[in-house]
Swiss-Prot record:
Record's subcellular location: Cytoplasm
Residues noted as binding ATP in the record, renumbered to the chain: K630
One of the Pfam families matching this protein, by short name: tRNA-synt_1g
Matching Gene3D superfamilies: 2.20.28.290, 3.10.20.590, HUPs (3.40.50.620), Isoleucyl-tRNA Synthetase, Domain 1 (1.10.730.10)
Keyword Ribosomal protein belongs to the record: no
Organism: Pseudomonas fluorescens (strain SBW25)
Protein name (record): Leucine--tRNA ligase
GO BP terms in the entry: leucyl-tRNA aminoacylation
Any one GO MF annotation of this record: aminoacyl-tRNA deacylase activity
Length: 868
């Protein structure tokens, strides 16, 4: 055994052992309790960052701990490999996305292996490989035939230069983020998942997830956005519109119906189109609206604009004529593309009516009174008693809701309705590096799904995109085909799927990644699913986690899985943050410097007072801590840390820096401190082992001093078991081990009994650290005399008898002030404790001349003597 801690040597040996033994390859073992632990798989961007290290270390600690509980633990890993960054890198470097992606995977896989993760690499999946996306295409065809996937025209942001659809986030100030072209609104045919058909279940089954953070469930509830309201119809006739019919609106405030003074429709609404036929001004306004954002958030904050159409509808209860306006704050895809405007009680309507001098009629008595003068107050939107509403006066919200519904039903002009904010999920992308949509377009037969025996539709991998639209649309060798139904020449779909589709079912594929008979092997899926512990960033709270829940229900309804939810427990890990350093250039731009290139000056209390760039010795500004990011150049390369200190040090620091759900602040001194701690463990173990291993501890013959040491050992086991097993507070578990190390370093080693006690202490330290620092634990466990590997050892169990104290130290107070301590037998009665306290010399001194009025004894803690 080396006298000094040699992490590289130790880690190479441990990893070689695990590889040779296939230590983490698992299979179904009926009768043995399973535990499926999964961290969100990475996008192969090129290099691991510290966020990855933290995410995968958390998952690994949980996996290794559960294995020590005797469970059959599955921890797989794969690659979320399709997506835009590969196309961008391909254009920049003139290389095919496939080549770039596979090279990145090879490099990052080596990095992950060097962290010592207990991963079953035999189950690795790569989403850009045909053997993976074949099953995605198979499921697509099944769902298309069932109508769960359908095709319709949708309004999108179209980049006329790049010839592609952009997400709302990719439109900056009305221009394409890459081309700079003015974005057009276009209606293009796209494929949609009917996620709205599952909205109710997606909402209600959140209640079946007690192991999910409340914050994530709230975010999903808000995103799904269930609202109970009423569908109201405003009739019109030949005189007012040119034909008879009714304008449908959805409202969550039917109690305010008597306060409606106009109706507003979206630019795409049929009434707007009709009114614009002979109205050039309205045509121009509609075109302007269609060029605006389709994002709800943008619509909410933009200036409200509108034009009257000259059309009128009737109020359903009063028959009053209400003008129809086209307004830019009404979205065609929400509700029915029309709103009944009640300016007195809705802020957007109020703003619009004030701007265009439309009537404002108060119909609810709110805390601000019976009238609603400008400017808008939040109180105007409150529920309250109805006023100025005829027969409905005096009713509260629910009473008015019910009474107005009855009145509308009588006239056949309305009824209550539940609506969701959630929209169907459009998955068509005019991109190359994605999963091809398995549809063939035939002039005679329409859209025909690719038959199962012709799957997968393979994406050609030798393509270098140029950014102008989809390369597949310019490749006849890809899209020219025959119709599977009639045999006529046909054209293959050239859009690819949204990359969120691949990550919506990967967790299920891990159960049987090499199965060729279907998307999953049912018996394997039932054995492993649902995932017991899922780990990933809170930024995935809505989209990925909602889509994965949706997909699980789709797979259940296809008979592929038996459970209702994919992830039993969810841990959202915090970000890794680090200091930022910058200089402001003459033109106002910021230049950011990496912490490794900066030298800090500290005061006598170690507080940083200034920073300078090592390269030129000139000062730099300190910008505060922010999430590690390329944009701020404050990332730390995990590989350099592993090379310098070893993987165990990196893992220990990451777990010690903060609880997993909080942000962890990177600190060089913290890393060095973690390294020093592992050196201390090694040093103590070396000193102990070099004297030869002791015999068995005789617990019955322990001295009082030895009992205290053994109590520290079992107290550490008790606390760490709670911290790791129940609370995922790895930082406090590590603190327990550090406290135990302080005790063991001071423990005497004079007798065989002393050394046997240190042996028990070192074995405990090794086992408690095994999930966190697996390499050093692997080495020490064998050196401490065990023939089995530490990964096969059981988590230590506390000896409750060791925690029992023969004597207790009690605090003595006089009138609430600390005046001393007394040692008492743990079995002492309240009377014995009080008697001992009364004769304590400090008590006698501080109660001299006073009368003792009361003695309060808190068993095992303190005695308070009240005297006056």
């Amino acid at each position: 055994m080396h006298e000094h801690y040699q992490p590289r040597e130790i880690e190479n040996a441990a990893q070689s052992f695990w590889d040779e033994q296939k230590s983490f390859e698992v299979s179904e073992q009926p009768g043995k309790e399973t535990f499926y632990c999964l961290s969100m798989f990475p996008y192969p961007s090129g290099k691991l960052h510290m966020g990855h290290v933290r995410n995968y270390t958390i998952g690994d600690v949980i996996s290794r701990y559960q294995r020590m509980q005797g469970k059959n633990v599955l921890q797989p890993m794969g690659w979320d490999a399709f997506g835009m960054p590969a196309e961008n890198a391909a254009m920049k470097n003139n290389v095919a996305p496939a080549k770039w992606t596979y090279e990145n995977i090879a490099y990052m896989k080596n990095q992950l292996r060097s962290l010592g993760l207990a991963v079953d690499w035999s189950r690795e999946v790569t989403t850009c490989k045909p053997d993976y996306y074949r099953w995605e295409q198979w499921l697509f065809t099944r769902l298309f035939e069932k109508g769960v996937i359908y095709k319709k025209s949708g309004t999108v942001n179209w980049d006329p230069i790049d010839q592609t659809v952009l997400a709302n986030e990719q439109v900056i100030d009305g221009r394409g983020w890459r081309s700079g072209a003015l974005i057009e609104k276009r209606e293009i045919p796209m494929y949609y998942f009917k996620i709205t058909a599952y909205a109710d279940e997606l909402l209600s089954s959140l209640d079946d997830l007690p192991g999910w953070p409340e914050q994530v469930k709230t975010m999903q509830r808000n995103w799904i956005g269930k609202s109970k309201g009423m569908e109201v119809q405003f009739p019109y006739n030949v005189d007012s519109i040119g034909e008879a019919g009714a304008l449908k609106v959805f409202t969550t405030r039917p109690d305010t119906l008597m306060g409606a003074t106009y109706v507003a429709v979206a630019a795409e609404h049929p009434l707007a189109t009709q009114a614009a036929q002979n109205n050039p001004e309205l045509q121009a306004f509609i075109a302007e609206c269609k060029g605006g954002s389709v994002a709800e958030a943008d619509v909410a904050t933009q200036e409200k604009k509108g034009l009257p159409t000259g059309l009128f509808v009737e109020h359903p209860l009063t028959g009053e004529k209400l003008p129809v306006w086209v307004a830019n704050y009404v979205l065609m895809h929400y509700g029915d593309g029309a709103v009944m405007a009640v300016p007195a009680h809705d802020e957007r309507d109020f703003e619009f009516a004030t701007k265009y001098s439309l009537p404002i009629k108060s119909v609810v008595r709110t805390s601000s009174g019976d009238t609603n003068p400008a400017p808008w107050q939040d109180a105007y939107g409150e529920h309250g008693e109805l006023i100025n509403s005829g027969e409905f006066d005096g009713l509260d919200f629910q009473g008015a809701f019910d009474a107005i519904e009855v009145a509308l039903i009588k006239k056949n002009l309305g009824a209550s309705r539940t609506q969701f904010r959630l929209r169907d999920w459009g998955i068509s992308r005019q991109r190359y590096w994605g999963c091809p949509i398995p549809i063939i377009h035939c002039e005679s037969c329409g859209d025909v799904p690719v038959p199962e025996d012709q799957l997968p539709v393979v994406l050609p991998e030798d393509v270098v995109p140029d950014g102008a639209g989809s390369p597949l649309a310019r490749m006849p060798e890809f899209y020219e085909c025959s119709c599977p139904k009639c045999g006529q020449p046909a054209k293959r779909e050239t859009d690819t799927m949204d990359t969120f589709v691949e990550s919506s079912w990967y967790y299920a594929r891990y159960a049987s990644p090499h199965y060729e008979g279907g998307l999953v092997e049912k018996s394997a899926a039932d054995h492993w699913l649902p995932v017991d512990q899922y780990i990933g960033g809170i930024e995935h709270a809505i989209l990925h986690l909602l889509y994965a829940r949706f997909f699980h229900k789709l797979m259940r309804d296809e008979g592929l899985v038996s459970s209702n939810e994919p992830f039993k427990n969810l841990l959202t890990q915090g970000m890794v943050v680090a200091e930022t350093y910058y200089r402001r250039e003459a033109n106002g731009a910021y230049t950011w410097f990496n912490p490794a290139d900066v030298e800090l000056e500290r005061d006598s209390k170690a507080k940083v007072i200034s920073a300078k760039l090592i390269a030129d010795g000139l000062p730099v500004e300190i910008g505060g801590t922010e999430k590690m990011a390329k944009s701020k150049n404050n990332g730390v390369d995990p590989q350099s840390m592993i090379d310098q200190f070893g993987a165990d040090t990196c893992r220990l620091f990451m777990m010690f820096a903060s609880p997993p759900d909080m942000s962890a602040e990177w600190s060089d001194s913290g890393v060095e401190g973690s390294h020093r701690f592992l050196k201390r463990v090694w040093r103590l173990a070396h000193a102990h082992i070099s004297q030869g291993l002791p015999g068995k501890l005789d617990v019955a013959a322990l001295s009082d001093e030895q009992k205290l040491i053994r109590r520290s050992i079992h107290l550490a086991i008790k606390q760490a078991s709670q911290d790791v097993g129940q609370n995922h507070k790895f930082n406090t578990a590590i603190a327990q081990v550090m406290t135990l190390m302080n005790v063991l370093e001071k423990a005497p080693q004079a007798t065989e009994q002393d050394r046997a006690l240190v042996q028990e202490g070192l074995e405990t330290v090794t086992l408690l650290l095994a999930p966190i620092t697996p390499h050093i634990s692997h080495d020490l466990w064998n050196r401490l005399g065990h023939s089995d590997a530490v990964i096969d050892a059981r988590w230590p169990v506390q000896d409750d008898s060791a925690l029992v104290q023969d004597t207790l130290q009690l605090v003595i107070q006089v009138n609430g002030k600390l005046r001393g301590q007394i040692d008492m037998p743990a079995t002492a009665s309240r009377e014995d404790v009080e008697a001992a306290a009364r004769v304590n010399e400090n008590v006698l001194r501080f109660t001299e001349g006073l009368t003792i009025r009361k003695v309060i004894v808190v068993p095992g803690k303190l005695v308070n003597i009240v005297a006056s």
